[in-house]
Each structure stands twice: as C-alpha cells, then as structure tokens.
C-alpha cells in the first residue's frame, strides 16, 4: 500500500490577496504605505493648486492670493483660516461651512485640508521608504533622514499654531507667505537669536558644506578608467571595483587639515547626522516658540542702552528692529485686532 503524504494547501484570505497585489513588482511600487501616501499627496497637491488658482484670502487676511486675482507664482498662497475659527479642523460638513463649498473656501478650509493631508502624505512617504527598505533587505536610514523634513513641517504648520490662539498664525502655503511668516517669527519671537535656530542653521549649512566637499573629493579622486572625454561613461552600476580612491582622498585632506576621515561608513553617517540633527533642533525650537519661550535676552545691554544714548550694540539694534517689525506688521497682519498706531509712534529709519 502506498501512502502519499503532502502538505495541505493553505487557504489564502483576502488579506493575502491584497498583500500580493500591493507588493507586486510594477513601475511605481504601491505597497501598504501607498494606501496613505498616494491619496493624501494627490489631495494636498490638488488642494494647493485649486486654492492658489481660484481662492481669495480677502475674508481671512484681507489679501489677494490667487492667480485669478492677478498674483504670480511667488505671491499666490493658500492663507491660513480666519482668526475666529480658532483650532477648528474646518470640515466641509462641519458647523462652520455646513456643506457650503464657497463658504468653506472663504473661511480658510483649504488651508487645513492641505496641511493635514500634506502631513499624512509626508508620513506615508517615510513609511514607503521603510517598507521598500525591508523588502529589498537594506537598512532604513533613508526613512530616518526623512524624519527631519517631517518634523519641520509638523512643527511649523501644526504645532506652532496649536500653541498659539488660532490656525490663523500658521504660515500660508506660498513663497511670499512663508517669507512673511519668517519676518513674523523674528519680530515677535526674536527667532534668529534662538539657540535652536542657530543649531538648525549650523546643521543645514554644515550639511551643504559636507555635501559639496564630499562630491568634489570623489570627483577629484576618480580612477582614470575610460577613454572618453569625461569619466562618467566609464562607470557601471554593477561593477565590483571602486570608482574612486579613498586612500588618495584621505591623503589629500590629511595635508589640508591634518586630519581626515579614514572610514567611509563613519564619513557617510556624519553626512547624515549633521543636517538631520539640524532639522530636528530647529523643529524643537519652533515648538518652543509655540509656547512663547523666549530666546537669549541680554537685559543688561538693553538697560544700559536705555540710559546711555551713545551705547549701542548689534543686539540692541536688533531689538529695535523687532519692535519695528511688530509695529508695522500688526495692523496689516492681524486685522481682527483693529490696531491703530499714530504715525508719531511708528519707528522711522534714517532712509524713510
């Protein structure tokens, strides 16, 4: 008698079928992260394009902000909601808009729509890098690096206005709108004298410097392994040998500075660490601003400058500039407060 022993075929459930379809090899990988990434990215980008093309900011900021009103690419924006909306999520079906799309746009609903979907899209993109790294079998350092931009976006567009009294104080989605927000941070928070801003600048500019030095050093030490006019065509993605000389690069920088990286892994980790740490530090600083934490205050210099007209430092000059920013920006930037400053109390520069 013959006995056939076999493994019973397991029943494939709907989850397994969906998992196979999401992870199928295609031109654009979808994956589980794509369920979050693609809809949110589509809606946030679509909301921004719609708002900058058609929607005015007259009802929220008293400004023109769309192509339809004559703005250009640098001046269009989706402005933050009206101050009276507080921290409402401004759903289209909520009590503020009540399914009225025109009213929803007027009170700033597109801003919250774009901000929230944009935040989830960035998180989805980070998860996408983790998912693909796991499938390919590599480390998830790309995703770790991308947490820096996510932290900046969430802290600036969500955490800061949450710490303030309304979404109104968030930056608008536009080039000139971001510039206005930067001036606001300086005038009302003295942001450039905040140590977390200093660490952020050091990280970003330091990362740019490291990137430039690394790229130039690699180009300088390429092996002459081709007969073409340039060395780019001599490289093959699948080649087993090195394409540049680490030993030569180490000797070069040892002569320049006296010290140099001798370990490629430490070098590239350092290039990852510097800019990402800078982004995270600036994000922490923005969260501090949300709760109105102050930057460095050199009160002794302010007191001496108040008593001695001949004593002035760059710090005291910057404090006066901040006062000027507040005085000039407040009436236009916060129309709901109905500020009215007499001409004689507004700061006047020598050139005015």
From Swiss-Prot:
The chain crosses the membrane at residues 40-60, 124-140, 152-165, 207-227, 278-294. It comes from the Bacteria. It is a multi-pass membrane protein. Its EC number is 1.10.3.9. Keywords: Chlorophyll, Chromophore, Electron transport, Iron, Magnesium, Membrane, Metal-binding, Oxidoreductase, Photosynthesis, Photosystem II, Thylakoid, Transmembrane, Transmembrane helix, Transport. Its main location: membrane. It catalyses: 2 a plastoquinone + 4 hnu + 2 H2O = 2 a plastoquinol + O2. SUPFAM superfamilies: Bacterial photosystem II reaction centre, L and M subunits. Pfam families: Photo_RC. Belongs to the reaction center PufL/M/PsbA/D family. PSII is composed of 1 copy each of membrane proteins PsbA, PsbB, PsbC, PsbD, PsbE, PsbF, PsbH, PsbI, PsbJ, PsbK, PsbL, PsbM, PsbT, PsbX, PsbY, PsbZ, Psb30/Ycf12, peripheral proteins PsbO, CyanoQ (PsbQ), PsbU, PsbV and a large number of cofactors. It forms dimeric complexes. 2 of the reaction center chlorophylls (ChlD1 and ChlD2) are entirely coordinated by water. This is Photosystem II D2 protein. It comes from Trichodesmium erythraeum (strain IMS101). The gene is psbD.
């Amino acid at each position: 008698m013959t006995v056939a022993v076999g493994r019973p075929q397991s029943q494939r459930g709907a989850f397994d079928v969906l998992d196979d379809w999401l992870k199928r090899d295609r031109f654009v990988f979808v994956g589980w992260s794509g369920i979050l990434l693609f809809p949110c990215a589509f809606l946030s980008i679509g909301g921004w394009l719609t708002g900058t093309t058609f929607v005015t900011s007259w009802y929220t900021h008293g400004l023109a902000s769309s192509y339809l009103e004559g703005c250009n690419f640098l001046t269009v924006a989706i402005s933050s909601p009206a101050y009276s909306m507080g921290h409402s999520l401004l759903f289209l079906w909520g009590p503020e808009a009540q399914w009225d799309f025109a009213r929803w746009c007027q009170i700033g609903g597109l801003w919250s729509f774009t901000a929230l979907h944009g935040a989830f899209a960035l998180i989805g993109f980070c998860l996408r890098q983790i998912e693909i790294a796991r499938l390919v079998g590599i480390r998830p350092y790309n995703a770790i690096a991308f947490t820096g931009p996510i932290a900046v976006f969430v802290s600036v567009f969500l955490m800061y206005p949450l710490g303030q009294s309304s979404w109104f104080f968030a930056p608008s989605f536009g080039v000139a709108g971001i510039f206005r927000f930067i001036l606001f941070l300086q005038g009302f928070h003295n942001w450039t004298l905040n140590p977390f801003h200093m660490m952020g600048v050091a990280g970003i500019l330091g990362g740019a410097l490291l990137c430039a030095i690394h790229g130039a050093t690699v180009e300088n030490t390429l092996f002459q392994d081709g007969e073409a006019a340039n060395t780019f065509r001599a490289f093959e993605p699948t080649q087993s040998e090195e394409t540049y000389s680490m030993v030569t690069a180490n000797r070069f920088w040892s002569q320049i500075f006296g010290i140099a990286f001798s370990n490629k892994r430490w070098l590239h980790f350092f290039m990852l660490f510097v800019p990402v740490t800078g982004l995270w530090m600036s994000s922490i600083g923005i969260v501090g601003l949300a709760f109105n934490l102050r930057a460095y205050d050199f009160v002794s210099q302010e007191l001496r400058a108040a008593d001695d007209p001949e004593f002035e430092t760059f710090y005291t000059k910057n404090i006066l500039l901040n006062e000027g920013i507040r005085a000039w920006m407040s009436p236009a930037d916060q129309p709901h407060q109905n500020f009215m400053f007499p001409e004689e109390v507004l700061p006047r520069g020598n050139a005015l």
